[in-house]
Amino acid sequence: MRSLAVAIAIACSVVASGVAQEGAAPQRAPDVIFVPTPPDVVDAMLKLAKVTSSDVVYDLGSGDGRIPIAAAKTYGARGVGIDIDPERVREATANARSNGVADKVTFLNEDLFTANISPATVVTLYLSGPVNARLAGKLMRDLKPGTRIVSHAFDLGDWKPLQTVTVSGRPIYFWIVPPAPRR
Protein backbone atom coordinates (compact mmCIF):
# COMPACT_ATOMS: atom_id res chain seq x y z
CA MET A 1 0.00 0.00 0.00
CA ARG A 2 2.84 2.37 0.87
CA SER A 3 4.49 1.82 -2.52
CA LEU A 4 1.18 2.68 -4.21
CA ALA A 5 1.01 5.95 -2.26
CA VAL A 6 4.62 6.78 -3.24
CA ALA A 7 3.87 6.01 -6.90
CA ILE A 8 0.80 8.27 -6.82
CA ALA A 9 2.80 11.07 -5.18
CA ILE A 10 5.52 10.80 -7.84
CA ALA A 11 2.96 10.79 -10.65
CA CYS A 12 1.25 13.87 -9.20
CA SER A 13 4.54 15.75 -8.93
CA VAL A 14 5.43 14.93 -12.54
CA VAL A 15 2.04 16.20 -13.75
CA ALA A 16 2.31 19.32 -11.58
CA SER A 17 5.79 20.12 -12.90
CA GLY A 18 4.52 19.90 -16.49
CA VAL A 19 1.72 22.36 -15.76
CA ALA A 20 4.10 24.73 -13.97
CA GLN A 21 6.21 25.00 -17.12
CA GLU A 22 3.21 26.40 -18.97
CA GLY A 23 2.87 29.23 -16.44
CA ALA A 24 1.22 29.71 -13.10
CA ALA A 25 -2.41 28.73 -13.54
CA PRO A 26 -4.66 31.69 -12.78
CA GLN A 27 -7.34 31.09 -10.17
CA ARG A 28 -10.33 32.67 -11.93
CA ALA A 29 -12.68 31.92 -14.79
CA PRO A 30 -12.09 33.25 -18.31
CA ASP A 31 -13.58 36.66 -19.13
CA VAL A 32 -14.85 35.42 -22.51
CA ILE A 33 -15.64 32.07 -24.08
CA PHE A 34 -13.31 30.75 -26.78
CA VAL A 35 -14.55 31.56 -30.27
CA PRO A 36 -11.97 30.95 -33.02
CA THR A 37 -11.01 33.78 -35.34
CA PRO A 38 -11.80 32.82 -38.96
CA PRO A 39 -8.69 32.18 -41.11
CA ASP A 40 -9.37 35.10 -43.48
CA VAL A 41 -9.63 37.44 -40.48
CA VAL A 42 -6.36 36.06 -39.01
CA ASP A 43 -4.63 36.78 -42.33
CA ALA A 44 -6.09 40.29 -42.51
CA MET A 45 -5.09 41.07 -38.89
CA LEU A 46 -1.47 40.08 -39.50
CA LYS A 47 -1.35 42.01 -42.80
CA LEU A 48 -2.87 45.11 -41.19
CA ALA A 49 -0.18 44.97 -38.49
CA LYS A 50 2.49 44.54 -41.20
CA VAL A 51 4.04 41.60 -39.32
CA THR A 52 7.62 40.71 -40.26
CA SER A 53 10.17 38.12 -39.16
CA SER A 54 11.57 40.59 -36.62
CA ASP A 55 8.25 40.89 -34.77
CA VAL A 56 7.13 39.32 -31.50
CA VAL A 57 3.37 38.79 -31.82
CA TYR A 58 1.44 38.46 -28.55
CA ASP A 59 -2.10 37.10 -28.79
CA LEU A 60 -4.10 37.85 -25.65
CA GLY A 61 -6.76 35.20 -25.16
CA SER A 62 -4.98 32.97 -27.66
CA GLY A 63 -7.39 30.01 -27.60
CA ASP A 64 -6.17 27.32 -30.00
CA GLY A 65 -3.12 29.42 -30.95
CA ARG A 66 -4.03 30.07 -34.55
CA ILE A 67 -2.86 33.72 -34.64
CA PRO A 68 0.69 33.24 -33.23
CA ILE A 69 1.02 30.04 -35.28
CA ALA A 70 0.02 31.88 -38.48
CA ALA A 71 2.45 34.72 -37.66
CA ALA A 72 5.27 32.19 -37.31
CA LYS A 73 4.36 30.11 -40.38
CA THR A 74 3.60 32.98 -42.75
CA TYR A 75 5.99 35.70 -41.62
CA GLY A 76 8.65 33.93 -39.55
CA ALA A 77 7.71 36.02 -36.51
CA ARG A 78 8.03 34.79 -32.95
CA GLY A 79 4.72 34.37 -31.16
CA VAL A 80 3.45 34.28 -27.60
CA GLY A 81 -0.09 33.26 -26.76
CA ILE A 82 -1.57 34.04 -23.36
CA ASP A 83 -4.70 32.25 -22.20
CA ILE A 84 -6.26 31.76 -18.77
CA ASP A 85 -7.66 28.32 -19.73
CA PRO A 86 -5.04 25.55 -19.30
CA GLU A 87 -6.90 23.31 -21.76
CA ARG A 88 -6.57 25.97 -24.49
CA VAL A 89 -2.85 26.33 -23.68
CA ARG A 90 -2.33 22.56 -24.09
CA GLU A 91 -4.31 22.59 -27.36
CA ALA A 92 -2.35 25.56 -28.73
CA THR A 93 0.99 23.99 -27.76
CA ALA A 94 0.01 20.78 -29.59
CA ASN A 95 -1.11 22.84 -32.61
CA ALA A 96 2.25 24.64 -32.71
CA ARG A 97 4.06 21.28 -32.70
CA SER A 98 1.85 19.85 -35.45
CA ASN A 99 2.39 23.00 -37.55
CA GLY A 100 6.18 22.81 -37.16
CA VAL A 101 6.55 26.13 -35.31
CA ALA A 102 7.02 25.00 -31.70
CA ASP A 103 10.50 26.58 -31.80
CA LYS A 104 8.98 30.00 -32.63
CA VAL A 105 5.76 30.01 -30.59
CA THR A 106 5.14 29.78 -26.83
CA PHE A 107 1.83 29.56 -24.99
CA LEU A 108 1.44 30.69 -21.39
CA ASN A 109 -1.35 29.87 -18.95
CA GLU A 110 -1.64 33.35 -17.49
CA ASP A 111 -4.15 36.11 -16.84
CA LEU A 112 -3.89 38.68 -19.64
CA PHE A 113 -4.43 41.49 -17.12
CA THR A 114 -1.31 40.57 -15.11
CA ALA A 115 0.93 38.96 -17.74
CA ASN A 116 4.13 40.67 -18.86
CA ILE A 117 3.40 41.80 -22.43
CA SER A 118 6.22 44.35 -22.71
CA PRO A 119 8.31 42.33 -25.23
CA ALA A 120 5.49 42.51 -27.81
CA THR A 121 5.90 44.46 -31.03
CA VAL A 122 2.40 43.38 -32.17
CA VAL A 123 -0.60 42.51 -29.97
CA THR A 124 -3.70 40.76 -31.30
CA LEU A 125 -7.08 40.54 -29.58
CA TYR A 126 -10.45 38.86 -30.03
CA LEU A 127 -12.05 39.34 -26.62
CA SER A 128 -15.12 41.54 -25.97
CA GLY A 129 -15.93 45.24 -25.79
CA PRO A 130 -15.86 45.45 -21.97
CA VAL A 131 -12.67 43.36 -21.69
CA ASN A 132 -10.92 45.43 -24.37
CA ALA A 133 -11.95 48.66 -22.61
CA ARG A 134 -10.49 47.35 -19.32
CA LEU A 135 -7.33 46.23 -21.14
CA ALA A 136 -6.67 49.55 -22.94
CA GLY A 137 -4.87 51.15 -19.97
CA LYS A 138 -2.55 48.15 -19.57
CA LEU A 139 -1.72 48.24 -23.28
CA MET A 140 -0.82 51.95 -23.06
CA ARG A 141 1.24 51.46 -19.88
CA ASP A 142 3.03 48.22 -20.67
CA LEU A 143 3.75 48.40 -24.40
CA LYS A 144 6.55 50.33 -26.04
CA PRO A 145 5.68 53.25 -28.34
CA GLY A 146 5.31 51.94 -31.87
CA THR A 147 3.80 48.61 -30.83
CA ARG A 148 0.93 47.71 -33.17
CA ILE A 149 -2.40 46.46 -31.79
CA VAL A 150 -5.03 44.70 -33.88
CA SER A 151 -8.45 43.66 -32.57
CA HIS A 152 -11.06 41.52 -34.26
CA ALA A 153 -14.66 42.70 -33.76
CA PHE A 154 -14.16 44.94 -30.70
CA ASP A 155 -12.56 48.37 -30.30
CA LEU A 156 -10.67 49.68 -27.25
CA GLY A 157 -13.37 51.95 -25.87
CA ASP A 158 -12.27 55.61 -25.85
CA TRP A 159 -8.98 54.87 -27.65
CA LYS A 160 -9.91 55.55 -31.27
CA PRO A 161 -8.39 53.24 -33.90
CA LEU A 162 -6.09 54.59 -36.60
CA GLN A 163 -7.69 52.29 -39.14
CA THR A 164 -10.71 50.01 -39.40
CA VAL A 165 -11.17 47.42 -42.14
CA THR A 166 -13.95 44.92 -42.73
CA VAL A 167 -13.28 41.32 -43.76
CA SER A 168 -16.20 38.98 -44.45
CA GLY A 169 -18.47 41.44 -42.64
CA ARG A 170 -16.23 41.52 -39.54
CA PRO A 171 -14.53 44.72 -38.34
CA ILE A 172 -10.81 44.72 -37.59
CA TYR A 173 -9.38 47.67 -35.65
CA PHE A 174 -5.77 48.91 -35.73
CA TRP A 175 -3.81 51.13 -33.31
CA ILE A 176 -0.17 52.07 -32.75
CA VAL A 177 0.97 52.82 -29.20
CA PRO A 178 1.90 56.53 -29.21
CA PRO A 179 5.01 58.03 -27.63
CA ALA A 180 4.69 58.71 -23.91
CA PRO A 181 3.64 62.30 -23.15
CA ARG A 182 6.45 64.62 -22.08
CA ARG A 183 6.40 65.83 -18.51
Question: What residues fall within each predicted segment?
Answer:
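A short SAM/SAH-binding and catalytic strip from SAM-dependent methyltransferases
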Residues: 117-134
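Class I SAM-dependent transferase core
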Residues: 21-52
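S-adenosyl-L-methionine
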Residues: 86-119
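Conserved SAM-binding motif I beta-strand of class I
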Residues: 78-83
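Conserved class I S-adenosyl-L-methionine
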Residues: 54-63
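Bacterial N-terminal signal peptides
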Residues: 5-15
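C-terminal substrate-binding/active-site "lid" region of AdoMet-derived donor-dependent transferases
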Residues: 130-183
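Glycine-rich SAM-binding Motif I of class I
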Residues: 65-69
